[in-house]
Amino acid sequence: MDTTATIGWGIAGTGRIARTVLDDFAHVPGARISAVASRSIARADTFADLVSQSLGTPRPNAHDSYAEMIANPAVDVIYVATPHPQHRPIALAAIEAGKAVLVEKSFAATAEAATEMAEAARAHEVFAMEGMWTRFLPVVTEMIDAVNSGAIGEPTGVQGDLFALRDYDPEDRLFSPALGGGVTLDLGVYALDFAIRLLGEPTEVIARGKHFPNGVDSDASMLLTFPKDKFATLAISLTSDGPGRMTIQGTDGWIEVEPRFHHPSRILIHRRGVIPKVHNTPALGRGYAHELIEVCECLRAGRTESQTMPLDASLAVARTMANILDQLGVENHDDTELPS
């Protein structure tokens, strides 16, 4: 693909996260939303109008069929912004059609589906990436560079939380067993990805938690052990408020990621006897633009995976979440057919 080529995007799903990400396309050079799809043509039409109004661009095609949008020749990459169980069939259909995919986190509702999606992308040599936007934020990139350069010595552990108090509504996707609701897939994915990126895949996981009345996981505390006796202690909740802070411990110092850690703009690097070094780097837009830019750059360069968010990292997180959910007694399922 030409290094200056315009990338045509299709958006599968018109709900909360699709609307949140939409405005950040204004910060992505050479990206065009060519099509949107929902199971309802009314919702697709409304969202297509919103795209045009928000971005000041031509109105994208509106589809009431995900298969039709995937087949649209103006679409190069599909952003899968549907509930977790629907990621599998939409992503697989797109991959089999040769279309790249950016799959909203969590990558899938189960580790088995995540593995199937990754294997399909590799077999078809099609780009696939989980939408873990935190990894691409400028200040997070600076944090990783600092760790890799030895700013705090050898990292030894991670400690943090992500609490987001929500009113229980069994009709809402966030709380629905059928739609992959629950704290682990919604918030835990951030905390686990943060720890796994720094320390690798855990060798042991101990999890305890609570549930909503319908059995969906509401809270969890996790103790993870990693190679070389490194560890992480993490807490997540949909029933309590909390700061959303992360710290990285090292042999020569520590890093504080100020709340909220999954979309920070400021980190502090502490070393004994030294004034903390502050990194304060804002993101473009709401912060989603950086992952969208990464996808476009990968496609223009002919890459099938992102070096910043490789599929193996998504699979490590998926396996760890599966372990946690098993300990909490929660069983998720992925859809097998395209939503209709």
Residues covered by each model-derived region:
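N-terminal Rossmann-like dinucleotide-binding module
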Residues: 1-55
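C-terminal helix-rich "cap/oligomerization" subdomain common to oxidoreductases
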Residues: 1-3, 31, 77-79, 227, ...
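Contiguous beta-strand/loop segments that form the cofactor/metal-binding neighborhood of enzyme cores
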Residues: 1-3, 193-264, 282, 294-301, ...
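Hydrophobic residues in well-ordered beta-strands that form the structural core
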Residues: 11, 103, 128-130, 257
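Beta-loop-alpha module in the N-terminal Rossmann-like domain of NAD(P)-dependent dehydrogenases
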Residues: 58-120
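Rossmann-fold dehydrogenase core element
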Residues: 116-134, 154-160
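Predominantly a Rossmann-like dinucleotide-binding segment in NAD(P)-dependent oxidoreductases
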Residues: 134-206
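Active-site loop of classical SDR/Rossmann-like NAD(P)-dependent oxidoreductases
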Residues: 281-293, 309
